[in-house]
C-alpha cells in the first residue's frame, strides 16, 4: 500500500482571475486561503480551499484557449463530492450557477450534476449513495 494521503490541489490557469475567484469563492462558497505574489509584487497564484487540506490553485493571465469537452485528451473534469446533490444543486442554482447536466443517477449509482467554471473547465458535483460503486469500493478498501 502507498502512503498517499489525498489529492492536495488541482491547478488551473484562468483567463480572467476575477471571474474565476467570483465563481469559486463567491458562487461555490470556497474560502480564499491565500495569495502569492512574485518578486515584482505581481499576483502569481490564488489558493481557494475546497475542503480541509484540499485546494484549487488558480493562476492568472491564461492566454491560450483550448477545446474542453468529453473527447479532449488529458484533464477532463474536477469532481466535488457533496453530502446531498439535490440540496447543493438547489443552493448553487439559486446563487446563479449555470447547470450543464441536470441531477441524475450515473452508471456507478451515484447522484451527480455538472457545470463549468468561467474558463469552461467541467465540474461534476457527486453524492455517493450507499449503493454506489464508489461507496462500496471505499468500504472494501478501508477494510484491508
How does the language model describe each region?
Residues 1-3, 6-15, 45-50, 66-144, ...:
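Vicinal oxygen chelate
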Residues 2, 13-55:
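Core segments of cupin and vicinal oxygen chelate
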Residues 33-35, 43, 63-68, 101, ...:
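A short, acidic/glycine-rich surface segment
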